[in-house]
Amino acid sequence: AKGEIVRTHIMRPTWHYVAGKDLRWMLQLTSSRLKKVIDSWVKASGLDISENQYTQCNDLIGKMLSGGNCLTREEIEMELGHAGVPVTGDRVRRYVLRAEMEGIVCSGADKNGKPGYALLDEQVAPASSLPREEALARLAVNYFRSHSPATLKDFVWWSGLTVTEAQQAIGSIKELLVEEHFEGQAFWVFAACRKTENRDLIQLLPPFDEYLVSY
């Protein structure tokens, strides 16, 4: 309820839990790329959603959620339908995804077991924007500090960045990383977390464990 942790689509088109204070600068890094992914989905599904429709929906969603309101996607669909907006097929999901990409909405309180949406600016405290280079560096620090050892490919998959962007991010924090090679691959280890002593206990996590996959 305080917006300290929010659920949204931010690095890849899947749910992520994000610290509210980090949400805006992360959106600055990823939203344009994510919008292209969503647009390709729309085209592949045969839907025709224009930029004007997205703008109209963003405005309507902003109005219906203003004042601390929280609505489920089904409730948003009903309101959009009443306003004369096409809601057939998978359109409403795309409208809401775009509103997330634009930084208009994020998760609000769940309602009857279904995810609710609230206005980002009402749910999350204001935060300063970051220069792109600083945002890339911060994302890399957050990743390698919690996921080391990891490869460039790992970072690209997790972050949704391009290879060039990921390389730039790693390069900007190289003084914080140690490069190790194993079976022909370069792994980056966050130096402050590096341990050289042997461990008697090894803990394994399953694929797609939320701690590793989500942020």
Per-range role (PLM):
Residues A1-Y215:
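Long, low-complexity intrinsically disordered regions
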